């Protein structure tokens, strides 16, 4: 790292921040470990962060939030098995669903809007993916039980489809309008922790998957069976993992790691270009998002929230070009990129590859 990295705004809270989402004009939603969801107006020039509203949204932790495309509503899911839709300007709840008390609760791990501000998807700790329509009384319109570990991310594409990544090392491609079983990748022998699309202006769009080993694997859209490239860990540590990924531009990603750093990663050629920011505690980056205007990256780690200028040039990573791998040399990973899986998983009950469902997607 080549110098001091200064945050435009940095603030500590009493409780841990589990998720965040930027929306509207200089606004950010925060979901906390104590179940509260709060909305803040930020002014980087004045170095201010002003609470607009705050509410006790869940009895237990608020684990994930998602704002719809129009910025008018958001969904929050909690470890209490409750899902709520609310107005972003007031926090007032418009819809609520509760897991059947007679069933064993598997907490929701992730939620994401998919289509037309009406359809969204959830994933839970047991690997279940559900598609919801807020216009229906029961909410859920179809469910997929193809994974055997938690769902770590849901990434929509082309209006009706989405990719779900799982701790079991398998990703699934699902059509929100179709009840057929999803396309499943081969098991990757690495815990998938997050995912995001990139190279979206190119004919061969890529999907990047972060792993617990610190490796990022690239899948080609339409060829979901196995990864085509591997990008090795940016640091030499067996304890480093990729925790969160979000789009920077058509060819780059912001990558949050377990060391508290957010790095800019260029895709094809694959190179970690520089560190955007580093949290004070140097603990796991829990969530990242780009402000609506695109000039700041917002991240959280533990109780700390920070705003980082995306054009800040300190923190170049000159050695990152050495940490590359591809499908042509996948057996020559460096010694510090060995897989670090959460648990031993299998591929029992998975749909075999070779199906023609989603051809070309």
UniProtKB/Swiss-Prot annotation:
Highest rank taxon of the organism: Eukaryota
Which Pfam families does this chain map to? WDR55
Which regions does the record annotate with the repeat WD?
57-96, 103-142, 146-184, 187-229, 237-275, 280-318
**Biological process according to GO:** ribosomal small subunit biogenesis
* Sequence segments annotated as region (Disordered): 311-361
Please report any disulfide bonds recorded for this protein chain, giving both cysteine positions: none
Q: From the record, give the transmembrane residue ranges.
A: none
| GO CC term, one of those recorded | nuclear pore outer ring
Q: Which UniProt keywords apply?
A: Nucleus, Repeat, WD repeat
Q: Where in the cell is it found?
A: Nucleus, Nucleolus
Task: Tell me if Repeat is a UniProt keyword of this record.
Answer: yes
Asked if the keyword Protease belongs to this entry, the reply reads: no
Q: What is this protein called?
A: Uncharacterized WD repeat-containing protein C1A6.02
Tell me the organism. Schizosaccharomyces pombe (strain 972 / ATCC 24843)
């Amino acid at each position: 790292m080549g110098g001091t990295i200064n945050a435009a705004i940095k603030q500590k809270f009493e409780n841990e921040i589990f998720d965040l989402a930027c929306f509207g004009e200089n606004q950010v939603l925060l979901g906390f470990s104590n179940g509260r969801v709060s909305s803040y107006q930020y002014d980087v020039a004045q170095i201010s962060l002003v609470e607009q509203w705050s509410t006790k949204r869940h009895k237990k932790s608020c684990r994930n939030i998602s704002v719809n495309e129009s910025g008018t509503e958001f969904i929050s899911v909690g470890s209490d098995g409750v899902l709520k839709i609310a107005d972003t300007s007031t926090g007032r709840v418009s819809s609520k669903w509760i897991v059947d008390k007679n069933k064993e609760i598997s907490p929701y791990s992730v939620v994401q809007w998919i289509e037309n501000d009406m359809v969204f998807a959830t994933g839970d700790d047991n690997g279940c993916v559900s598609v919801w329509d807020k216009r229906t009384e029961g909410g859920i319109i179809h469910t997929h039980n193809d994974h055997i570990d938690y769902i770590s991310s849901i990434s929509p594409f082309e209006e009706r489809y989405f990719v779900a990544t799982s701790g079991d090392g398998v990703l699934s491609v699902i059509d929100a309008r179709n009840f057929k079983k999803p396309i499943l990748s081969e098991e990757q022998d690495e815990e998938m922790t997050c995912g995001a699309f990139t190279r979206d202006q190119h004919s061969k769009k890529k999907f990047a998957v972060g792993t617990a080993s610190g490796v990022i694997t690239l899948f080609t859209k339409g060829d979901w069976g196995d990864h085509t490239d591997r990008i090795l860990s940016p640091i030499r540590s067996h304890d480093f993992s990729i925790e969160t990924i979000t789009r920077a531009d058509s060819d780059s990603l912001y990558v949050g790691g377990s060391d508290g750093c957010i790095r800019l990663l260029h895709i094809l050629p694959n190179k970690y270009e520089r560190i955007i920011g580093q949290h004070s505690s140097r603990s796991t980056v829990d969530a990242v998002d780009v402000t609506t205007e695109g000039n700041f990256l917002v991240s959280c780690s533990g109780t700390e929230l920070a705003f980082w200028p995306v054009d800040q040039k300190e923190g170049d990573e000159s050695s990152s070009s050495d940490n590359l791998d591809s499908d042509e040399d996948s057996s020559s990973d460096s010694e510090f990129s060995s897989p670090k899986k959460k648990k031993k998983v299998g591929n029992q009950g998975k749909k075999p590859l070779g199906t023609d469902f989603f051809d070309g997607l």
